[in-house]
Amino acid sequence: MLKRNLSRRDFLKVAGIGLGTLAFRPLRLSPLEYLAIPKRLPQFPDSKIIGRVTDPGIYLRSKPTNAGGTDNVIQNLAADTLLEWDQEVVGNVIGGLSNQKYVETPLGYVYGSVLQPTRNIPNTPITEIPAGKSGFWAEVTVPYVDLTHEGNIASPWLNDHLSYNFPPRLYYGQVVWMDRIRTSNGFVEYRWNEDANGRGYGYGGSYGEYFWGEGAGFKVLTNEDVSTISPDVDPVEKTMTLNLDYQTLSCFEGNREVYYCQVSTGIHYTLDYSGEEVDYSTPPGTLLTHWKIISKNMTSGEEAGGSGYSTPAVPWCVYIQGGIAIHGAFWHNAFGEPRSHGCINATPEDAKWIFRWSMPYVSLDAGEERRSLPDHGTLVNSRKA
């Protein structure tokens, strides 16, 4: 049952889980010193689904509504706060948003769009690189993995984390290329090669940095993880329909719908301070898959409204027109509303299914596949309702 009146113990519990953002390192250590020390996985909440707060300053409320402003606020939650996920409920969200879902936790309600559903599935790590391989792909299967940095700091995302005194982490659903294993610190660690030695992962914005993370937080991907779904179906019969009004994506084999999910496509809005329109709308029309890559650094410079970004390890990318891709998104849970810079955001689980089902097939060894017209992969019908 939801505890609507918090005891002192409950209050200290929820207050304490928000301390990880600004107090992530011992006070005696500088940010650079903290980056260099090995890090174990923390003890995660004991819950089948664990909600991770994706944004700073999110309210924990006593009721599933923001009506009344802050009248029902219990606590201000920091980014990466972890909460036991009891159930989703239909709430009352004021402010023009279509998503009305809140997540009920033992301590209160959190707006669902800013709470990533994660799981804690630790793995038995391997201690040697697979024979004959230069490395391996690995998927994060815990809420997050704290990272140890090796070498020079170069990437905008890491510099941003340090400027805000926030720990660099990999999050549930991200996929990375590992090229080394060590046990010298008393536990197994994998080294994430952010550039991936030219394997394709580092295209477009990677900075060639190296990070270590505890191996138990990563599932080593196998051929089964990328095996084709419905391999006996004629590839021409596989198509996708993207509904820009309803923010949904459907996969078809002939006329039969075989998969459906909510997505977040490109956003179109007006800047409050200038009245300038910013249009990242995903285009309608017939779009053709021309590039698939297991994981990619996605980076854009400063644009209108100061909306540049640098996001490493974006998983399961299916490019369907220029730089527009269907891919996994771990930084929000606002699926069903426009949100992106033009790409089609899906949950990591949905993006992985689409990646495996769509054409062309991508093996672990290759890591990516490209097509040039007249050749192309799966066709996507992007349209309004």
What are these regions (language model features)?
Residues 25-68, 82:
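C-terminal segment of N-terminal export signals and the immediately downstream linker at the start
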Residues 33-44, 103-142, 194-234:
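Boundary regions of SH3-family modules and the immediately adjacent low-complexity/disordered segments
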Residues 65-79, 159-170:
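SH3/SH3-like (including bacterial SH3b) beta-barrel domains
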Residues 233-235, 270-271, 280-284, 291, ...:
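Exported/periplasmic cell-wall-interacting domains
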Residues 75-78, 247, 349-356:
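Solvent-exposed, polar/charged alpha-helical surfaces in well-ordered, non-transmembrane soluble domains
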Residues 76-117, 168-216:
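SH3/SH3-like beta-barrel superfamily modules
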Residues 181-285:
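Cell wall/extracellular polymer interaction/catalysis modules
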Residues 1-10, 17-20, 25, 32-34:
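N-terminal secretory signal peptides
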